[in-house]
From Swiss-Prot:
<dbReference type="InterPro" id="IPR029215">
    <property type="entry name" value="HMG_box_5"/>
</dbReference>
<feature type="region of interest" description="Disordered">
    <location>
        <begin position="546"/>
        <end position="576"/>
    </location>
</feature>
<feature type="modified residue" description="Phosphoserine">
    <location>
        <position position="584"/>
    </location>
</feature>
<dbReference type="GO" id="GO:0005654">
    <property type="term" value="C:nucleoplasm"/>
</dbReference>
<keyword id="KW-0539">Nucleus</keyword>
<dbReference type="GO" id="GO:0045943">
    <property type="term" value="P:positive regulation of transcription by RNA polymerase I"/>
</dbReference>
<dbReference type="InterPro" id="IPR009071">
    <property type="entry name" value="HMG_box_dom"/>
</dbReference>
<keyword id="KW-0597">Phosphoprotein</keyword>
<feature type="DNA-binding region" description="HMG box 4">
    <location>
        <begin position="407"/>
        <end position="475"/>
    </location>
</feature>
<dbReference type="GO" id="GO:0005634">
    <property type="term" value="C:nucleus"/>
</dbReference>
<dbReference type="GO" id="GO:0003723">
    <property type="term" value="F:RNA binding"/>
</dbReference>
<feature type="DNA-binding region" description="HMG box 5">
    <location>
        <begin position="482"/>
        <end position="549"/>
    </location>
</feature>
<keyword id="KW-0523">Neurodegeneration</keyword>
<keyword id="KW-0225">Disease variant</keyword>
<feature type="modified residue" description="Phosphoserine">
    <location>
        <position position="336"/>
    </location>
</feature>
<feature type="modified residue" description="Phosphoserine">
    <location>
        <position position="495"/>
    </location>
</feature>
<dbReference type="GO" id="GO:0006360">
    <property type="term" value="P:transcription by RNA polymerase I"/>
</dbReference>
């Protein structure tokens, strides 16, 4: 391919005549030696691997490395090369064993020569003469001229070439039959003539018929000429003519099904499924055309909003398709509730009429067709349930009768970026339409560096994780971004666009220009009301965005984002280590949950200071090991996962700060995490993890000695104990959050517990 087989390389031209002494066994040995010298993970282009091959290691018997290389070049020219060298050698082995099999059948020395076509006979006869007359012409130009000359030949002269061709063709067929008798082993994949032929599609039936007609008029036409002539005619056929071939295809398919069922009974060893027999030969468009002519009713719009849009769009042929739905949505909002209710009733009536007509249509069909239509209706209903109306974003304001909800916009990194930059671009370039603005934002996104994209991808991952954690309606509500704020001019335009479109007969371009001029000529006092509305809309957007980004406290404390392979967080101090030990050994399982934690607190008070120090050292050692494992794990993450983990840690700190209230110890770390989350991921993740651990250590050290009388800490850790009792795996998953809560409660009660600890040390 690509001229490799036709143009011999320097190596081929230099091949000595001694190469003929290679036997089949020697060639197979050569390929086996090459195979043994291939790299274990061979995935490069074959030329690359071939250039690195050590041919001296391939050499065997009295064949040197150079001889082996030359022979390989000769063999490799006989097989396709768009593969790895490993695959190529396997194919070469097959070629050496069966050099004349399959596609290489015509290369067998005994294979009869095919006769030249009438046109090619004429071409070979006249080419030399025309080449002398026009030496400046290329082969391509000569071919074009001779092709034109042949078409202009009278039928009598053409007949001479046709008769010579037919005579030689008969001789070729006799020689071919003789060749097949002499070489039966070379004829592979003989067609099983007893298997019924598969039914044709309507287009195939039409093409076969038209081809016969065309060849009667032009018997010397090539296959390419027939295809070029008939190629586009099928799509230009009228529905009535196409329906004729659809009916013929259906009749042929029924006959095929009956014949195939009889055939399968006679040949039970064949593994042919019922689905393979009954597979339709019609396309979706052809099936719909047939159903339409059979009287199948057209499905009505699914809701009142869709019905309104369908009626409005019939008069909006001049409006660009990208703007039609926007205009429909704006017009729908301007309708009164009474008008919307009228459309709702009209839609319900259309649905009832459709059901009656569909039942009549089904009665006229055979049972198999009834099942097919009912199946299609079921699938349509499933799909339509997900198709919602963009008109009723606030059902409480419109009574909930104006149609279904607007489909949610997909939460993606590019979408978050677009929403963030859209308002700024609208102010900088007000002349751009919505579609032009969207294209510009897409180009801006593509030009962003990977580091900057990672920031938005992290926010995407956080949003998706939040939507997965939230149940039911809350998940749906928070899983999408709030509607972007509108400018004062946009709010004013929405309120008056109906009047302007009516004035300019639905010419949207003229209406927009007129509105723009009116707005520019308005006094500031007149604009003030709309500016206030825009400011309120901006506040609404910022409020909804902050609510969406900030995870709810209850959800954050009960569930956490899971990262595969993240090391398990160890106890933060000696008291937690002591509690974990008692809870895990099952010694206190007979006690209720609260009593169990009280018992742990009392036991902690009773142990000596040296034992407490022992547990503290164990906790510190586990913390050191945890830091090492965490660093290794963070480095092993992909850039996207690392950014998502960083975003999660930052959000977790913010939420914990809100829960704790003002904390002088954590204020520095909180501010640091805020600044880190706003940068473009240029800091090292290891430093962030160390900051997090330092914060945890501070909380742990301050609360360690005060853990003996901290009842709130005991209640927090009781969650861990309960999970340990019911399921050890749940304990592992939620332990991190429990420990954070322990730190919080222990930190808040450190002042009260310090007196208890001092009295305990005095008693000791």
């Amino acid at each position: 391919m690509n001229g490799e087989a036709d143009c011999p390389t320097d190596l081929e031209m230099a091949a000595p005549k001694g190469q003929d002494r290679w036997s089949q066994e020697d060639m197979l040995t050569l390929l086996e030696c090459m195979k043994n010298n291939l790299p274990s993970n061979d995935s490069s282009k074959f030329k690359t691997t071939e250039s690195h091959m050590d041919w001296e290691k391939v050499a065997f018997k009295d064949f040197s490395g150079d001889m082996c290389k030359l022979k390989w070049v000769e063999i490799s020219n006989e097989v396709r090369k768009f593969r790895t060298l490993t695959e190529l050698i396997l194919d070469a082995q097959e070629h050496v064993k069966n050099p004349y099999k399959g596609k290489k059948l015509k290369k067998h020395p005994d294979f009869p020569k095919k006769p030249l076509t009438p046109y090619f006979r004429f071409f070979m006869e006249k080419r030399a003469k025309y080449a002398k007359l026009h030496p400046e012409m290329s082969n391509l130009d000569l071919t074009k001229i001779l092709s034109k000359k042949y078409k202009e030949l009278p039928e009598k002269k053409k007949m001479k070439y046709i008769q010579d061709f037919q005579r030689e063709k008969q001789e070729f067929e006799r020689n071919l039959a003789r060749f097949r008798e002499d070489h039966p082993d070379l004829i592979q994949n003989a067609k099983k003539s007893d298997i019924p032929e598969k039914p044709k599609t309507p287009q195939q039936l039409w093409y076969t018929h038209e081809k016969k007609v065309y060849l009667k008029v032009r018997p010397d036409a090539t296959t390419k000429e027939v295809k070029d002539s008939l190629g586009k005619q099928w799509s230009q056929l009228s529905d009535k003519k196409r329906l004729k071939w659809i009916h013929k295809a259906l009749e042929q398919r029924k006959e095929y099904e009956e014949i195939m069922r009889d055939y399968i009974q006679k040949h039970p060893e064949l593994n042919i499924s019922e689905e393979g027999i009954t597979k339709s030969t019609l396309t979706k468009a052809e099936r719909q055309l047939k159903d339409k002519f059979d009287g199948r009713p057209t499905k009505p719009p699914p809701n009142s909003y869709s019905l309104y849009c369908a009626e409005l769009m019939a008069n909006m042929k001049d409006v660009p398709s990208t703007e039609r739905m926007v205009l429909c949505s704006q017009q729908w909002k301007l309708l009164s509730q009474k008008e919307k209710d009228a459309y709702h009733k009209k839609c319900d009536q259309k649905k009832k009429d459709y059901e009656v007509e569909l039942l009549r249509f089904l009665e006229s069909l055979p049972e198999e067709e009834q099942q097919r239509v009912l199946g299609e209706e079921k699938m349509l209903n499933i799909n339509k349930k997900q198709a919602t109306s963009p008109a009723s974003k606030k059902p409480a304001q419109e009574g909930g009768k104006g149609g279904s909800e607007k489909p949610k916009r997909p939460v993606s990194a590019m979408f978050i970026f677009s929403e963030e930059k859209r308002r700024q671009l609208q102010e900088e370039r007000p002349e751009l339409s919505e579609s032009e603005l969207t294209r510009l934002l897409a180009r801006m996104w593509n030009d962003l560096s990977e580091k900057k994209k990672a920031k938005y991808k992290a926010r995407e991952a956080a949003l998706k994780a939040q939507s997965e954690r939230k149940p039911g309606g809350e998940r749906e509500e928070r899983g999408k971004l709030p509607e972007s704020p509108k400018r004062a001019e946009e709010i004013w335009q929405q309120s008056v666009i109906g009047d302007y479109l009516a004035r300019f007969k639905n010419d949207r371009v003229k209406a927009l220009k007129a509105m723009e001029m009116t707005w520019n000529n308005m006094e500031k006092k007149e604009k003030l009301m709309w500016i206030k509305k825009a400011a309120e809309d901006q506040k609404r957007y910022e409020r909804e965005l902050s609510e969406m980004r900030a995870p709810p406290a209850a959800t954050n404390s009960s569930k956490k984002m899971k990262f595969q392979g993240e090391p398990k967080k160890p106890p933060m101090n000696g008291y937690q280590k002591f509690s974990q030990e008692l809870l895990s050994n099952g010694e206190l399982n007979h006690l209720p949950l609260k009593e169990r934690m009280v018992e742990i607190g009392s036991r902690w008070q009773r142990i000596s200071q040296s034992q407490k120090e022992h547990y503290k050292k164990l906790a510190e050692e586990q913390q050191k090991q945890y830091k090492v494992h965490l660093d290794l794990w963070v480095k092993s993450l992909s850039p996207q996962d690392r950014a998502a983990y960083k975003e999660y840690i930052s959000n977790k700190r913010k939420s914990m700060t809100k829960l704790r209230g003002p904390n002088p110890k954590s204020s520095r770390t909180t501010l640091q995490s805020k600044s880190e989350s706003e940068e473009d991921d240029e800091e090292d993740e290891d430093d962030e993890d160390e900051d997090e651990e330092e914060e945890d250590d501070e909380n742990g050290d301050s609360s360690e000695d005060g853990g003996d009388s901290s009842e709130s800490s005991s209640e927090d850790e009781s969650e861990d104990g309960d999970e340990n009792e019911e399921d050890d795996e749940d304990e592992d998953d939620d332990e991190d959050d429990d420990e954070d809560e322990d730190n919080e409660s222990e930190g808040s009660s450190s002042s009260s517990s310090s007196s208890g600890d001092s009295s305990d040390s005095d008693s000791n």
